[in-house]
């Protein structure tokens, strides 16, 4: 049986459309059923608390991100910058790894260049080009968790930098290259 060129093109186009739309529908359904991502944050310097769903129905929630940026702000200058979503996802992964809702005490989130320079004058452990300046790092502690143990949990995620600051009793996590250190 001979099939004409026009008939072949028509059938091919219909097959292509049938194959595209179900995939799009399935992709949308997957996004809508994606689990919510929540964070509970407490800024140790300002006393502010935030319990927020920052990701729902496959999308980041812009109002929630603004609230998070505010909690992570440089408390010394009041300067606010966007915090990388990858960092929020890392905190969420830590919470999931602990297998329970986690209250993160935020010791240092975003830092202005000026604040970072001042801290460098006081401590040799503050990096000149700290990822805090980019909104890509946070120093945390979790109530009732030993920070040594928290450090180990963070290292197992293999998702960026992890620093343990024993004397100051906090763990630094960032979304830079995978590495870890103790001070």
Language-model-detected regions and their locations in the chain:
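Sec/Tat-exported extracytoplasmic proteins
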Residues: 94-98, 102, 114, 144, ...
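Charged, often glycine-rich, active-site loop that binds/positions anionic groups
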Residues: 114-128
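N-terminal secretory signal peptides and thylakoid transit peptides that target proteins
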Residues: 1-19
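Catalytic cores and adjacent binding grooves of peptidoglycan-active enzymes
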Residues: 2, 37-42, 125-183
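Extracytoplasmic/secreted envelope proteins and their assembly/folding machinery
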Residues: 88-92, 116, 147, 151
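C-terminal segment of N-terminal export signals and the immediately downstream linker at the start
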Residues: 22-52
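Active-site acidic/histidine clusters and adjacent loop/turn architecture
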Residues: 59-105
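Acidic helix-start/capping segments at beta-turn-to-alpha-helix junctions
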Residues: 103-117
